Structures are given as structure tokens and as C-alpha cells.
């Protein structure tokens, strides 16, 4: 028997006044719908996020298996980790222009979803700074990257940047363990990034510059029971453009199926995911976890119409 789990990340929502008190899912056309129901994907007392929620949907209780977001992303990037290593998600973000980072405002947690080539050039420009500080900065995809501290203590208090969009960053800068190092890296990276030619060109083009880094999602290497052993599935795969979801798959022993044209945002090739899924099922996969990030990105940006459109594209080009 074939099994497929499809997850439209962030697709559910609260009623929204500008939409007449409806949700995007209510207003979207989705003729392929089946039965609706309610479920709790994040256990009570745990922070709500794509990491804990996707672990649950994969079948792994976050209260048992969750060890942080960034080590899952590190797994998808092929970064080897020892049990004593600590990782952090490193976003390229846009902060308001302020002499002191404590006086800045979080303008954009993704720097206008910066292009991959630009992001890698910026990461390469600041990586020597990190090496000199005794840590590693690994380039990921678009605005999502990874900081690794080898044999380090954990316990930093960090805020996801998408939770403070449009707000002052004061009060949300690193606290707790590794505070001094993380804050120093942020401040020194900002000095380099603000002057970088890539950002000067982005400003001239009317795009947000990636003028700072932002650390969050601290964690250590997870230990997931292999999916095959846990559920008796002979061959399983993951289709997603998001490092986090790919990383859960890698840690669970599933295959990550590459799909050209998918972006982890709402300008993405929805149909390509559908075609890849059909081909995978025909070629011997018994289980697929298909993840689409588009609705979640629209939600973070407050783009209701784009979220409705994304839901309709999912129904028409993947489910149908």
C-alpha cells in the first residue's frame, strides 16, 4: 500500500477582518477537498513552529525527539555534528539603518527572500570573521543559513525574526549562554554587510538589503528512530524545498527527492512537486511526505490574497 502525507505549511488560519471575517482557506477554491477536522500538531507547553509541528506530522513526538530547529536544517545541508556541538539558524535579514543594532527595527526577516547567489556571496564575505572566532558559518538556501559551535554550551535565549517583523529588536537580542559571542558576530557582520556591493545593488533595485544576520533556533543533533523501523515502510521520500523538512527526512532515514523549480516560497513550481510525487510513487516509493511552504511564507508577510492563491495552486496542481 502507498501512503502520502501532504502538508500545506501555515495553510490554516484565524478569521481575518479584511477578508470579511473569513480565513484564506474558506475563500480559496479547492474542489479536491476531502474531510475536514481539527488536530493538535504542537504539544501543549511547546513553542509553536514548523519544527515541532512537522516532527509531529512525521510521527515523532516533539516532547521525546525535539532537540532544536537548526540541527535538523544542518542535517539537510550535510553538516556533520557531534553530540556536544551546538547549532543556530542564521537568517540574512533587513534591519533599519541605525548606528547601534539595539536601536534597529526588524524590517524583513528574509531580506526580500534574497536570491541564492547573492546570499552565498554575502555569507562568503563574512565567513572568515566566523572562522577567526572559532566557529563555522555554512551557506544554506536563500536567507536560511547555519552557524555551528563545536563542543559548546547551550542555553541561549533567542527570538525568531519573523515574530518581530516591524518591531524594535531591543529586548530580542541574544541573551543567556553564548550571548557575547553571538552579539559580537551580529554587530561585526553588520559592518561588513551594510557596505557590501551586493546590498548596494539591491538598494538601487528597490530591494531590501541583507544588512545583518540574526541567530535563532538553537539545538543539538537529534536522534530519530529510523522511519522504516518505526512504521515498517520499506522506502520513503520527502519532497520539500525547506531545509528543516528535508533535515527531518534525513534524520529519519528517508530519501530527499530533488525537484527543479521549487523555492520554499509562493513563487514556486507547484506542478513540479505533483509530477515528482507521481513519478516517485511509480518508481517504488511506498511513502511520501510532500511539504509546501508557500502558504506559511504568505502568512508571515501578511499577504492574504497571495495565500488564497497559493492554496488554490496546491489544490489544482498538486492534489488534483
Q: Over which residues does each language-model region extend?
A:
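Active-site nucleophile/metal-coordination loop of metallo-enzymes that catalyze phosphate/sulfate
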Residues: 2, 11-127, 148
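Residue-level marker for buried hydrophobic side chains located in beta-strands
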Residues: 4-6
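Short, hydrophobic/amphipathic alpha-helical packing segments
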Residues: 27, 119-124, 182-193, 270-278, ...
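Glycine-rich, mobile lid/loop segments that gate access to catalytic sites or pores
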Residues: 109-212, 218-220
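A long, amphipathic alpha-helix that forms part
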Residues: 206, 297-320
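Anion-binding catalytic surfaces of enzymes that hydrolyze or transfer phosphate/sulfate esters
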Residues: 220-306
Amino acid at each position: 500500500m502507498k501512503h502520502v502525507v501532504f502538508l500545506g505549511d501555515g495553510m490554516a488560519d484565524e478569521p481575518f477582518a479584511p477578508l470579511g471575517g473569513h480565513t484564506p482557506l474558506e475563500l480559496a477554491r479547492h474542489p479536491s477537498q476531502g474531510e475536514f477536522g481539527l488536530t493538535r500538531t504542537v504539544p501543549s507547553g511547546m513553542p509553536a513552529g514548523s519544527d515541532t509541528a512537522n516532527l509531529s506530522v512525521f510521527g515523532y513526538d516533539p516532547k521525546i525527539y525535539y532537540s532544536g530547529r537548526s540541527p535538523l536544517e544542518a542535517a539537510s545541508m550535510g553538516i556533520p555534528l557531534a553530540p556536544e556541538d551546538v547549532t543556530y539558524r542564521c537568517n540574512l535579514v533587513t534591519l533599519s539603518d541605525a548606528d547601534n543594532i539595539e536601536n534597529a527595527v526588524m524590517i524583513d526577516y528574509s531580506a526580500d527572500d534574497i536570491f541564492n547567489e547573492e546570499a552565498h556571496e554575502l555569507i562568503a564575505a563574512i565567513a572568515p570573521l566566523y572562522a577567526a572566532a572559532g566557529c563555522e558559518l555554512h551557506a544554506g538556501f536563500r536567507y536560511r543559513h547555519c552557524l555551528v559551535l563545536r563542543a559548546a554550551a547551550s542555553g541561549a535565549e533567542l527570538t525568531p525574526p519573523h515574530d518581530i517583523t516591524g518591531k524594535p529588536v531591543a529586548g530580542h537580542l541574544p541573551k543567556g549562554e553564548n550571548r557575547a559571542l553571538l552579539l559580537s558576530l551580529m554587530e561585526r557582520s553588520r559592518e561588513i554587510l551594510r557596505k557590501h556591493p551586493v546590498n548596494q545593488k539591491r538598494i538601487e533595485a528597490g530591494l531590501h538589503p541583507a544588512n545583518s544576520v540574526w541567530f535563532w533556533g538553537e539545538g543539538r543533533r537529534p536522534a530519530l528512530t529510523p522511519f522504516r523501523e518505526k512504521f515498517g515502510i520499506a522506502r520513503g521520500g520527502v519532497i520539500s524545498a525547506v531545509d528543516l523538512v528535508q533535515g527531518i527526512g534525513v534524520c529519519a532515514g528517508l530519501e530527499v527527492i530533488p525537484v527543479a523549480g521549487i523555492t520554499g516560497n509562493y513563487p514556486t513550481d507547484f506542478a513540479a512537486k505533483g509530477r515528482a510525487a507521481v513519478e516517485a510513487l511509480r518508481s517504488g516509493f511506498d511513502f511520501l511526505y510532500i511539504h509546501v511552504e508557500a502558504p506559511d511564507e504568505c502568512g508571515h508577510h501578511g499577504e492574504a490574497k497571495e495565500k488564497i492563491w497559493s492554496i488554490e495552486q496546491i489544490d489544482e496542481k498538486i492534489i488534483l
